[in-house]
Design a protein with these regions (language model features):
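Short alpha-helical segments used as structural interaction elements across diverse proteins
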Residues: 2-3, 249, 300, 725
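Bacterial N-terminal signal peptides that target proteins for export
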Residues: 1-11
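N-terminal pro-sequences and low-complexity stem/linker regions of secreted or lumenal proteins
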Residues: 432, 447-929
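A detector of low-complexity, intrinsically disordered, Ser/Thr/Gly/Pro/Ala-rich segments
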Residues: 13, 23, 245, 381, ...
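Intrinsically disordered, low-complexity, compositionally biased regions/tails
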Residues: 10, 124, 148, 175, ...
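Predominantly soluble domains enriched in secretory-pathway, periplasmic, or organellar proteins
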Residues: 16-467
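Residues at structural and domain junctions
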Residues: 8, 34, 43, 49, ...
Length: 929
């Protein structure tokens, strides 16, 4: 048993488990993932580590080499450059070839497409650009296909085949970072590509992801031979073409439409779209699309297989008439909830066996496709985290995964910093390596039962998720309040809690700055083994509200977070538009939905404050334009003021007197929900992410409505507290040290007090008997932690929490975002949304108290001492770099640079300590009670 430091008070320890890994056998270890699932490592096929997030693999025509496209964030080993790796299949030697054109600040990125030339002498890779699509600046390529010469398995850049802007059709308009794009044109942003037999050598068919089209070009000259428009209407992009596949004779091809729930059949010689084949489209136009992604032609080209990542299915299409004959079910045995994400395909040479990479199940499903009446898999092969590509080579199945074995501690200095002179801890996105495994198929056939059982265990489908047993028997909880904050690790805040597993040397915002969260943890329970499922805000807010992401999220966020060569297509926006308002699916939406949809379907009341809501600010509008500056609905005044400057009078809806804040506060013009279920279920006066808008005002607005809920309960008239309340309190993100913005300490202290005030109000109200409050960060990307880069703070607060102020509780159970979501669902009687939350054990130990937790009293010290009002000066460390950062939306600033600035601001010249722990602990117990 691990020993903990002594404290001035006794601590009630609920359960002791290891932090991440347990010894399963002398050969294997069980690794816990932030997805709540587990891996047995090493897994089948002796995986080798690769650069970050491989998305495509391709076998050379002679079968000697496997090329691997790594289009993630980049790792220290690759100098943070994207790369193509080459595996020599005879020797098993893996060599990586980073491309200097794809460094962390590059104006282009790899994106999905990889193919060998027909003679194996060249390798083609799609290269896409948003920030310099023209390729005008030195070192910038623009959009096109990078061509590499291959000699003895070694790559060297040979030429670049540029793609011009795609013409728009009549009435169409381009709405994806359209600034700088020529009129009547669209940015092609090449994705999947295929080599096509041409008259004079190789041609290339390229999916143009942002232009909603496909183009056939000469592989040498780049001359456009045919162009195919694939838009569903006038908005470009809307269908987002993903991949292409062509017949051997070069006459026909198919293009999968990521957001179109379809594939388009193309006549390559005639230059026509033969037909569009719908594949499990949504019932409503704005519901999630089926995500047609990877495609594969059978060896005899009579069947086309299409992975539908958002439907847990693979479509089997007869190429003779374009009809979908059947759909293969990629779910695991006994799986009743969705969420497997089939996103890659491979087939045996005899056409009998189809291999499907289930990204969300960490497994490959194996189908006998000649058994026409059967649609379920024969068995499953376990993989490392998030398989993204598969290929068959002889008796081997080659499997690439996007996230390998995850992260680990990030408490030391970055060995090879991306930005010299700005040393910081390793950034979570640069710690995620992919992997490539070689599984012997004959052996997997023999071991299929054992392998399938391992997949079921890894997906927690053989265990019990537990029940919440209150001391008095009946579940008293009728209301849940869920608070989502931004980006902090456990050690940054709670590393100073002596009786839990923290590292004091990593504390940046300890008890003096976050007294309320410390007090809450000590009263209601310290969770020192909690992990955020998301890596960054782009996927973190999806994880935190849907208990899953989408394959679109996973394949784009690392590009967004490396050099901004993709838009932040999350939280209800894609490019320059809101899909809901455009009447089309949001490509980022998981098919299994969000919490608010689950609540609506089961007739529970809910209200949302700031999450998946877009605020338009008066600072962005013309003065005196009509807007709702936070006034009650139906009484919209104009934006008479854009902001409140220091010392100016506060507007009535924000308080009385003069502003005590030393920085200007923007005013709300109006709010727009980005999801249909949030219409009429959001507070129009509550701000979204903007970190210069104090969390005190957000708390004020919620408490204004909460006062009405209390009155309604006391009088029995009016609207009472909804069953579910979602609050976004984002200011612990900070605005760095930008002059004239709140200091990091001010932002974090402001956020802390807002949390404390909400809990104080609820716990001193009639709702205390039947309300539970949950608090987490959407991700933990903005700090160091000595256990794992995903480890973060979480609070579970109710009258039924165990422990007392004299004997605080410490819970060492392994928990993630998914456990927290499943617990909220269980308390409200909601079914799970998907296979993730369905099998994540509930946080039952946190409701074993005697219903005697007293009301909470907030700590106002940092209001009274003025900390929350302070602004950065021009002399603050990192002020010049912070001044160039965008803090209007989540993570628009370079998080790695921001982290270095925040460390300097908090710790001065103190160097980061070396990692004290590894992710492999001595023992682990997964509780099922």
């Amino acid at each position: 048993m691990q020993m903990f430091r002594r404290s001035a008070v006794a601590w009630f320890v609920l359960t002791l488990v290891s932090l991440a890994v347990a010894q399963s056998t002398p050969q294997q270890q069980e690794l816990n993932l932030p997805s709540s699932k587990t891996l047995q490592v090493p897994g089948p096929g002796a995986p080798q580590r690769t650069n970050s997030f491989p998305t495509a693999i391709a076998l050379s025509p002679d079968g000697k080499y496997l090329a691997i496209l790594n289009n993630g964030r980049g790792t220290p080993e690759s100098k943070f450059e994207q790369s193509i790796a080459v595996l020599e299949l005879t020797s098993n030697q893996l060599r990586d070839f980073p491309d200097a054109r794809l460094g962390v600040d590059a104006k282009q990125t790899y994106f999905l497409g990889l193919a060998w030339s027909s003679d194996g002498s060249e390798l083609y890779a799609s290269m896409a650009s948003e920030s310099d699509p023209h390729g005008r600046n030195a070192g910038d390529t623009g959009n096109g296909v990078a061509v590499y010469q291959v000699r003895d398995g070694a790559l060297s850049p040979e030429r670049f085949v540029k793609l011009d802007f795609a013409p728009l059709g009549k009435g169409q308009h381009f709405a994806y970072n359209a600034k700088g794009i020529p009129k009547r044109k669209a940015n092609p942003y090449p994705a999947g590509l295929a080599v096509v037999k041409g008259r004079d050598g190789d041609d290339l068919l390229v999916a143009e992801n942002l232009a909603d089209g496909a183009v056939l070009i000469d592989a040498r000259s780049g001359k456009v031979l045919q162009r195919f428009g694939l838009t569903r209407g006038n908005l470009v992009p809307s269908n987002l073409p993903y991949g292409v596949v062509a017949t051997r004779n070069g006459s026909r091809a198919w293009c999968s439409l990521w957001n179109g729930s379809a594939v388009a059949e193309l006549d390559l010689r005639g230059g026509k779209v033969v037909r569009t084949i719908p594949l499990l489209p949504p019932e409503k136009n704005i519901d999630p699309s089926s995500h047609a992604t990877a495609m594969l032609l059978s060896p005899d080209e009579s069947r086309l297989y299409v992975a539908l990542a958002n439907r847990d299915a693979v479509a089997v299409i007869a190429t003779s008439d374009g009809k979908a004959e059947r759909y293969l079910d990629t779910r695991l045995p006994g799986q009743t909830y969705g969420g497997t994400f089939p996103n890659a395909l491979a087939q045996s040479s005899d056409g009998k066996t189809l291999y499907v990479a289930n990204a969300s199940s960490d497994a490959v499903a194996v189908f006998d496709v000649l058994a026409r009446s059967k649609t379920s898999a024969e068995y499953f092969i376990p993989t490392e985290w998030y398989p993204t590509a598969v290929a068959v080579h002889g008796d081997e199945l080659l499997i690439a995964t996007g996230k390998g074995q995850g992260t680990g501690p990030n408490s030391g200095w970055e060995e090879n910093p991306e930005h010299p002179g700005k040393r910081s801890h390793p950034y979570i996105a640069t710690m995620i390596r992919g992997s490539i495994a070689r599984v012997h198929l004959a052996e997997s056939e023999r071991e299929q039962k054992k392998l399938t059982e391992e997949v079921l265990r890894s997906n927690l489908m053989e265990g019990r998720t537990g029940e919440i047993a209150f001391q008095r028997g009946i579940n008293p909880i009728r209301h849940v309040i869920y608070i989502i904050k931004e980006n902090r690790t456990y050690d940054q805040l709670f590393g100073d809690i002596a009786s839990a597993n923290g590292d004091p040397s990593l504390v940046m915002y300890g008890e003096a700055i976050t007294p309320n969260q410390h007090k809450l943890a000590k009263q209601f329970g310290v969770l020192d083994n909690f992990y955020d499922s998301g890596e960054v805000s782009g996927d973190g807010h999806v994880w935190s509200t849907s208990a899953i992401t989408s394959d679109y999220t996973e394949k784009t966020w690392e590009i967004v977070y490396r050099s901004k060569e993709h838009e932040y297509d999350y939280e209800g926006y894609v490019g320059d538009y809101m899909p809901m308002n455009a009447g089309i699916p949001d490509v980022d939406d998981p098919a299994t939905g969000y919490l608010w949809g689950n609540l609506a379907r089961h007739n529970l009341t809910y209200r949302n404050y700031g999450e998946f809501v877009s605020t338009t600010w008066c600072t962005d509008m013309e003065q005196n334009s009509p807007a709702s500056t936070g006034a009650p609905s139906g009484h919209p005044p104009s934006c008479g003021r854009r902001e409140v400057k220091p010392g100016e009078d506060l507007p009535p809806n924000l308080g009385t007197g003069k502003s005590p804040y030393q920085f200007a506060i923007p005013l709300i013009a109006y709010n727009t929900p980005t999801k249909p279920e949030l219409k009429d279920h959001f507070d129009p006066n509550y701000a979204d992410f903007q970190v210069e808008y104090p969390d005190q005002f957000r708390a004020d607005e919620f408490l204004r409505e909460f006062t009405g809920f209390v009155k309604a309960r006391e009088t029995g008239t009016g609207n009472q507290l909804p069953n579910f309340v979602l609050l976004r309190l984002p200011n612990d993100h900070t605005a760095g040290t930008r002059p004239g913005s709140p200091t990091p300490n001010a932002s974090v202290a402001d956020n802390d007090l807002a949390v404390g005030r909400v809990v104080e109000a609820v716990s001193n109200s009639p709702y205390w008997d039947d309300t539970a409050i949950f608090v987490l960060e959407d991700d933990a990307q903005s700090g160091a932690d000595h256990v794992d880069a995903h480890r973060s703070i979480a609070l579970v607060i109710s009258k039924y929490s165990p422990g007392t102020a004299q004997q605080p509780a410490v819970d060492h159970h392994f928990y993630t975002t998914l456990n927290l979501i499943h617990t909220m669902e269980a308390l409200l009687g909601l079914p799970p949304m998907n296979n993730n939350d369905a099998h994540a054990p509930v946080m039952a130990p946190l409701f074993t108290g005697a219903a005697e937790q007293p009301a909470f009293k907030a700590d106002y010290r940092n209001r009274d001492n003025g900390m929350i009002y302070q602004a950065n000066t021009r002399n603050a460390p990192g002020a010049k770099a912070s001044a160039k950062m965008n803090f209007s939306i989540a993570d628009a600033a370079d998080t790695n640079v921001l982290n270095a600035i925040l460390w300097k601001a908090a710790k001065g010249n103190v160097p980061m300590p070396v990692p004290q722990h590894t992710v492999f602990a001595e023992e682990k117990k997964r509780d099922e009670d």
